[in-house]
UniProtKB/Swiss-Prot annotation:
Protein name: Geranylgeranyl pyrophosphate synthase atmG
Catalytic activity, as annotated: isopentenyl diphosphate + dimethylallyl diphosphate = (2E)-geranyl diphosphate + diphosphate; isopentenyl diphosphate + (2E)-geranyl diphosphate = (2E,6E)-farnesyl diphosphate + diphosphate; isopentenyl diphosphate + (2E,6E)-farnesyl diphosphate = (2E,6E,10E)-geranylgeranyl diphosphate + diphosphate
Factors inducing expression: The onset of expression correlates with the onset of aflatrem biosynthesis in stationary cultures. Expression is induced by the developmental and secondary metabolism regulator veA.
PROSITE patterns, per the entry: POLYPRENYL_SYNTHASE_1 (PS00723), POLYPRENYL_SYNTHASE_2 (PS00444)
Top EC class, one word: transferase
Biased composition (Polar residues): 19-48
GO biological process entries: alcohol biosynthetic process; isoprenoid biosynthetic process; mycotoxin biosynthetic process
Sequence positions that bind Mg(2+) 3: 232
Cofactor note: Binds 3 Mg(2+) ions per subunit.
GO molecular function terms listed in the Swiss-Prot or TrEMBL record: (2E,6E)-farnesyl diphosphate synthase activity; dimethylallyltranstransferase activity; geranylgeranyl diphosphate synthase activity; metal ion binding
UniProt organism field: Aspergillus flavus
Site note Important for determining product chain length, residues: 140
Record-listed E.C. numbers: 2.5.1.-, 2.5.1.1, 2.5.1.29, 2.5.1.10
Length: 340
């Protein structure tokens, strides 16, 4: 107690402290699941602690209610046919990866000025940019907090390493776009290995902490991440379903150097048309259709298909080697079939 303070002030201070403590959830009470609003409310408080949690998580929960392909969960289930970790541990890791993936999508959509995600308006067009950034950052730390449930000290090292790699990859992707610098194919593959492969690796590394199986799966995981992103690049310029979910040829509007765009530019460096289209960030369908035809004229769609076929063949060879050590996984073949 501070001497010389009137008793009535001490009573007020004590009351304020109690109200503040009651207004926010403790770290142990935070959930990674969407929380429903409660009708009751403490006297003198405009909203309950769970109301505040719901507000903070609003953009995250908005996107979670419209699930995507859930390829990361399917990948984890496929690898678990080899790793054989308990279902409750798998679910914890899946929640961690799900939160991180959702957070990264929220930030990506802001950085890319996207209009649609999974066929609905992007979160920041509903909640605003500031609230969406805060919700995404909150989800990163909610995922980190959930690591405690694994009770594996090395999990924190894995978490930090892969999030750093993810942000390094994203940083280079943004730099190339904003400086209109076309990378080489090798630089692009390194970038997507960091960015897209990051959460794939994080999931499998955390699963390996829970498993007695010691085989090295990371080469296959890295390759699957590369295949997934290059396939995504192809569909962005080719798929009607992709256009419905994210917009027609969104990579061109974003000014993004995707796998096909990089090949097309590098196949004829003297022709600046595609670079100029990327610079414009055009939303005009006629301009984007012209760009797609130019990309086709440089053989970039055919080249992308050939590279994907080569990568998939390499992945199948890796699976064959792993099967000699850890047995058959139907889920892995389902993943490979999905990526065809």
């Amino acid at each position: 107690m501070i001497s010389g303070v009137p008793d009535r002030w001490k009573v007020v201070a004590s009351s304020l402290s109690s109200n503040l403590d009651a207004s926010y959830p403790t770290s142990s009470s935070l959930s990674t699941e969407p929380i429903d609003t409660r009708s009751s409310s403490p006297q003198g408080s405009a909203s309950t602690p769970v109301d505040k949690e719901k507000i903070i998580r609003g953009p995250v929960d908005y996107l979670l209610k419209c699930p995507g392909k859930d390829i990361r969960r399917k990948l984890m289930q496929a690898f678990n046919e080899w790793l054989r970790i308990p279902e409750d541990r798998l679910n914890i890791i899946a929640e961690i990866v799900g939160l991180l993936h959702t957070a990264s999508l929220l930030i990506d959509d802001i950085q890319d000025s996207s209009k649609l995600r999974r066929g609905i308006p992007v979160a920041h067009s509903i909640f605003g940019v500031a609230q969406t950034i805060n919700s995404a950052n909150y989800a990163y730390f909610a995922a980190q907090e959930k690591l405690r449930e694994l009770n594996r000290p090395k999990a924190y090292e894995i978490f930090t390493e892969e999030l750093l790699r993810l942000h390094r990859g994203q940083g280079m992707d943004l730099y190339w776009r904003d400086s209109l610098t076309c990378p080489t194919e090798e630089e692009y593959i390194e970038m997507i290995s960091n960015k897209t492969g990051g959460l794939f690796r994080l999931a499998i590394k955390l699963m390996q902490l829970e498993s007695e199986v010691t085989s090295d799966f990371l080469g296959l995981v890295d390759l699957l991440g590369v295949i997934f992103q290059i396939r995504d690049d192809y569909q962005n310029l080719q798929s009607d379903l992709y256009s419905k979910n994210k917009g027609f040829c969104e990579d061109l509007t974003e000014g993004k150097f995707s796998f096909l765009i990089i090949h097309s530019i590098n196949s004829n460096p003297g022709n600046q048309q595609l670079l100029n289209i990327l610079r414009q960030r055009s939303e005009e369908e006629s301009v984007k259709k012209y760009a797609v035809e130019y990309i086709r004229s440089t053989g970039s769609f055919a080249y992308c298909q050939d590279r994907l076929a080569s990568f998939l063949h390499e992945a199948k060879m890796m699976v064959n080697v792993l099967e000699d050590n850890v047995g058959f996984s139907k889920g892995i073949y389902d993943i490979l079939a999905f990526l065809l």
